[in-house]
Amino acid sequence: ILIGRKEEIDMYEIKEIEKAVCDGKKIICFNKDITFPTEKGEKPGNGAVVKIIEEDLGIVINSLGKPDDYYIKYFLDNNIHLDFVIGDRVDTDIFFGTKLNAKTVLVNSGVSNFEDVNNADIVIESFSKVVPFIF
């Protein structure tokens, strides 16, 4: 089972996923972003669904995205060095950059950050302000 973002998901779908996992199906997700921004404000993201399933079943679902260990391991195993990681989420982008010993830049995109924004090396108001920091 691969969990990706859907605009709407209901408890029936979550229970069906949980039943399949209990029946032995493997599960992984694209990302664990709790929310995602829309023109009308934030909506529950893929991570909100993943968190429900993890808590209901007492499991940890691996992710293909930042900052999961699979993703970090790929960079480390292939000697890929990043000078900067730029993103709008502390819990994914900034955490990922920190794990790779990169300088981290948090862009205030309007996404609620549930982690301390002081975890980022640099905090800026818009992506256009990033350029002076990296060049």
Language model: regions and residue ranges:
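Asp-based, Mg2+/Mn2+-dependent phosphohydrolase catalytic module
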Residues: 2-135
